[in-house]
Amino acid sequence: MQIVHSIADLRAILSSKGRPAFVPTMGNLHDGHLSLVRAARQHGDIAVASIFVNRLQFLPHEDFDSYPRTWEADCAKLEAEGCDLLFAPREADLYPEPQTFKIQPDAQLADILEGHFRPGFFTGVCTVVMKLFSAVFFASGGGTAVFGKKDYQQLMVIRRMVEQFALPVNIVAGDTARADDGLALSSRNGYLSDDERQQAMALSLALKQLADAARAGQAPLAELEAWAMQSLAAQGWEPDYLTVRLRRDLQPPAEGAQLAGAPLVALGAARLGKTRLIDNLEF
């Protein structure tokens, strides 16, 4: 596996390697990330990953400084999975000067759910992804990027950005990797204490119960969502949201036929102790 830090070196290598399949990450890799690398190997001529902890998508009180950085372990995992090229830019490589031009995503999609509780998050995500796409796909004129469904709203926002800017990038969605008890794999799971880890699967269970109740029409959706929030709170969590949305645009479904038959997704975010977890379930 080759490792490069500068955009110029990245583009020079990729100028003769065909169509890249790209997996952007912030490092601290787990099997969820590695499953995306495995998918990338099926969708391009060269599998490229990046590791960059993007300051722009963290709020001032969030964990940018303490976010786990596990460079040597990450490199070993990527090489074992057959990643061909790792792009690991320094902050000065991606942001050589203050980033005054930023991507402002569609508010209807990006200012809800995660965007409501983490204002500016998707502006930071879209800005860094656009810069990464420019670096990775410049030489080939396009390729594939693989994003996980675990960050469902992020996947939707990136897809919309690609559509709006007519970028020559095919977005492939990778399924959420889970532990044996159903907990979605996340780099932030490492923040959980042993006791919290035993309780952490409650979020995925709450989403499953919400999805089942919503599809069965057991009560108006707002009541079911409130019940799910209360149920999780009673177990010691601090939920931000548990909600059912249309998969196509993350807007609330109408009661009745649309709720009964449309492709839906249950999404949730909640804090257990000091750790904020997110998850989702398509149904």
Curated annotation (Swiss-Prot):
One of its GO terms (biological process) is pantothenate biosynthetic process. It catalyses: (R)-pantoate + beta-alanine + ATP = (R)-pantothenate + AMP + diphosphate + H(+). Pathway: Cofactor biosynthesis; (R)-pantothenate biosynthesis; (R)-pantothenate from (R)-pantoate and beta-alanine: step 1/1. Pfam families: Pantoate_ligase. The active site is at H33. Beta-alanine binds at Q57. GO terms for molecular function: ATP binding; pantoate-beta-alanine ligase activity. It is an enzyme of class 6 (ligase). Keywords: ATP-binding, Cytoplasm, Ligase, Nucleotide-binding, Pantothenate biosynthesis. The keyword Coiled coil does not apply. HAMAP family: PanC. Catalyzes the condensation of pantoate with beta-alanine in an ATP-dependent reaction via a pantoyl-adenylate intermediate. This is Pantothenate synthetase. It comes from Delftia acidovorans (strain DSM 14801 / SPH-1). The gene is panC.
